[in-house]
Design a protein with these regions (language model features):
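Glycine-rich phosphate-binding loop of ATP-dependent small-molecule kinases
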Residues: 1-235
Length: 235
């Protein structure tokens, strides 16, 4: 079982449970979430609370290619040809990663698996004890992403509704007055990405739900409340 260690209570903010200690041997977590759901923020908090390292297959692929490992050389052939890297290559990378000392109690997978066959292959090499799905209504995702803009000078990130500049048109960090938006931060592109995400993850969610380890977390709330629900699910 997992032992939860609470943090000091804050008089103005929800109590954030700060540490989950695993006592069950090597078990891993899978983290789902559409773009704009705040998955990156929660991933960092899960790592801080559980001690499990985050495993991103994209990062692992790039590192393996850069290092010129056997698996990296194999992956590069497909990447250079503009093809998807086969599942077995990804699984080989994961096998190597979970042998590292920091993964002795498990890892947190981010961005993998994406398909049921990948989930089945993953189950052959590590025990997935919890699957966390951070869910936010599509219209809220569109608002979050399309309202983002950054300072052209220092890269500080703002949002029209949630985090505007203190002084209209002036960056709080550097005082610059030029801002930019990502070209793909528009409603049409975001909705297309969300549709692809839902189509991809729906069968996978059903598969994990059938295992009794799938946890839906309401991501349309305060960050601390989301974190607490995730850590409760990991007990």
């Amino acid at each position: 079982m997992a032992i939860l260690r609470p943090s000091v209570v804050s008089p103005t903010r929800p109590t954030v449970k700060t540490e989950v200690v695993y006592a069950r041997g090597m078990e891993s977590i899978v983290l789902f979430g559409p773009p704009g759901a705040g998955k990156g923020t929660q991933a960092q908090r899960i790592m801080d609370s559980t001690g499990l390292p985050q495993v991103s297959t994209g990062d692992m692929l790039r590192a393996a290619v850069s290092a010129g490992t056997t698996t990296g050389i194999e992956a590069k052939k497909y990447m250079d040809a503009g093809q998807l890297v086969p599942d077995q290559v990804i699984i080989d990378l994961i096998k190597d990663r979970i042998k590292e000392p920091d993964a002795k109690n498990g890892v947190m997978f981010d961005g993998f698996p994406r398909t049921v066959p990948q989930a089945e292959a993953l189950a052959d090499i590590t025990t997935v004890s919890h699957v966390i799905s951070i869910e936010v209504p599509d219209e809220r995702i569109v608002d979050r992403i399309c309202g983002r803009y950054t300072c052209a000078g220092c890269g500080a990130v703002y949002h029209e509704s949630f985090k505007p500049t203190s002084k209209d048109g002036i960056c709080d960090s550097c005082g610059g007055d030029e801002f930019k938006r990502r070209a793909d931060d528009n409603a049409e592109t975001v909705m297309s990405r969300l549709e692809a995400y839902h189509n991809q993850t729906s069968p996978l969610a059903d598969w994990y739900e059938s295992k009794g380890i799938f946890h839906v977390i309401n991501g349309d709330r305060a960050i601390d409340l989301i974190t607490n629900d995730i850590l409760d699910a990991l007990k």
